[in-house]
């Protein structure tokens, strides 16, 4: 068995594999190992663009950051992005195909060699590889063509750690049931079990752990407590994304429209941790209320989500609030929705070839097959209404979109990239704005000025200049916290022994 790798497989989706892989990567990095994550296939709308313009899943970006290395699409060679009844397939960072659900099995057969080649390239660069599976590892109906779980472990001869989530209940049955559905050779590959998301006192749980070990004849390597770590989520299945009422009266209230195909919600993680700012995800008029700012985020299917906004009456309510003075802000697909017209004559997004936008910005968007994926340095070139100190602020982020937006005479540039190209506009009064730039709020100076202007307008206490920590420093603190909790509760020495290090 190859002793340079290890693979975390799950009893189900969302058991915490991604977080545990990030934890082990940071633990090993702190011991001076050159370590990299790897996940053959990801299914997520929450993607990232690397320095070389490749698209990859956010989970492997987090794991790369935990490993203190530059993210590479080789770490996640296959990314599936479901949208409008079909799925966009990203291979090694570039659009490969759009497929129907019934085509998955045939696709996997084609991509198996590409996955192995990507793994080999990563393993040649790093001492240790920590792999992650996808969903549950014992889906017997998918087993023959699966390239992300046990077949991947066998392909690269990796020992396996099985991860189970106790918080959802039935943890013992899920572990035993999963192992029983594996073949004898597959079970032999499983060298340990981690029970994740435990609440309560461990001493009361220890007899159950011992009984489990007696049944499965595999050691439980630890019980990971249910603890909050402020790191980017893999997809939108998160407690953060839900309708909320506005909280304290002294908070700036920002309502983010929860779109059906919402993508890249990590754009707002920074806002979530600013004192005196209340972030709400809203999907009905009942919860919209009267916020200080409405943000329409990115989406994998702009036209369909725009139609849903109209059907739910949220579109009308957003327009009314804008007319009464609420700042409306759009990012990527949300930016396109704010315009006058969206044209999709090539059927890039689906079968709707034309849709009127909200009409708040004088832009028209035409979708095409070419997908823009690039990291961007940019600058704010216009202040907004009542937000007077953001002009000339530098921005760093990324673009990831289909479509080109043509700017009309009743809109003015809001953001330009380093080459002078307009990547965001506002109306002439500065009361509505949008941009293609993801990650805009990760630029601390811009966000400090943006939030303080809102606070000043409401006579709230302002943020100090250093109150909003540098994003990279904050993330690093969270990875260290995660690594410590992992080391305190999981038998890292045993994991290293399994890996042969």
Swiss-Prot record:
Boundaries of every GATase cobBQ-type domain copy: 251-446
Active site: residue positions: 332 (nucleophile), 438
Gene Ontology biological process terms, A to Z: cobalamin biosynthetic process
Involved pathway(s): Cofactor biosynthesis; adenosylcobalamin biosynthesis
Entry similarity comment: Belongs to the CobB/CobQ family. CobQ subfamily.
HAMAP family in the record: CobQ
Alphabetical list of NCBIfam families matching this protein: cobQ, PRK00784.1
Protein name: Cobyric acid synthase
